[in-house]
Structures are given as C-alpha cells and as structure tokens.
C-alpha cells in the first residue's frame, strides 16, 4: 500500500468522493497515511463529508500524475485512537485547526473492504485488494 501513498503524495491534489442522498459529491483532501499496510484518510467531523461517510461509508479517492491515475474504492470506518494520535504526530499542522480552543474534531478513517485501481490513459493497468 506504500505505492498508493507515494502516488497520492506525488500527485499533490487528490479527491474524495461520497454520496449525499442520491447526489454524488467530490472534494479535494490533503491527509492520507499508510501504517503497517493499512490506509487512512482524515476529514473534519464538523464537515458535511464526515456526515455523508457516517451515513454511507462507501467512498472513492482519485488522483492523477504524469498521465497515470489511481482510484481507491473502499469502506471508510473510524480509526482507533492510537491511529488518530499517529496522524496528528505525522501532520503537525492539524493541531492548528483541530484543538481544544477551536472545538473542532478530526475524523480519522481507515479504508477497508476495497480495492485500488492503477490506470493509464490507455485503461486499467491492474487492480489490487486493500
């Protein structure tokens, strides 16, 4: 799964898709981590995206870099506190947003029960299970 994390970091911008009722929604996100072969992302619990994921945990993450792209389809489930602590340690800027003073909480989500599709402009190259 390190390949997924490296691809997303190289791409710079990547996008998280959810469903709001019967309407698809997509937005850029910036936090994506891999720990011990497990994939995680994070969003603010005060945001619509978090409520959408709690209602329907099926998500997609997509990014493009150098005429190749990646699509991660998964179920996003809340991560255990030890992972939340690691995400904060590895992304110190999050403390400026999510802290006791702001009252905002970060929702760290593990990506499970999914697959990663590696593609080029010619079509899918390969698919791997999470």
Give names to the regions the model predicted.
Residues 6-20, 59-62:
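A short, Trp-centered hydrophobic/proline-enriched beta-strand micro-motif
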Residues 71-130:
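Charged, gly/pro-rich active-site loop segments
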Residues 23-25, 75:
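Residue-level signal for well-ordered, solvent-exposed loop/turn and beta-edge residues enriched
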Residues 11, 56, 91:
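Acidic-histidine catalytic/liganding microenvironments
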Residues 32-67:
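A short mixed-secondary-structure module that forms the rim of ligand-binding clefts
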Residues 28-30:
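Conserved beta-strand in the GNAT
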Residues 15, 39-40, 60, 71, ...:
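General beta-strand recognition
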């Amino acid at each position: 799964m390190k390949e997924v994390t490296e691809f997303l970091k190289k791409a710079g911008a990547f996008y998280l898709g959810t469903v709001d009722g019967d309407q698809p929604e997509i937005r850029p996100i910036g936090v994506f981590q891999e720990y011990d072969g497990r994939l995680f992302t994070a969003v603010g619990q005060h945001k619509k995206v978090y409520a959408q994921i709690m209602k329907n945990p099926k998500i997609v993450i997509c990014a493009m870099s150098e005429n190749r792209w990646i699509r991660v389809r998964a179920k996003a489930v809340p991560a255990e506190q030890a992972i939340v602590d690691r995400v904060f340690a590895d992304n110190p800027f999050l403390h400026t947003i999510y802290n006791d003073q702001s009252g905002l909480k970060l929702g760290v989500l593990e990506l499970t029960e999914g697959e990663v599709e590696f593609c080029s402009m010619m079509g899918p190259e390969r698919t791997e299970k999470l």
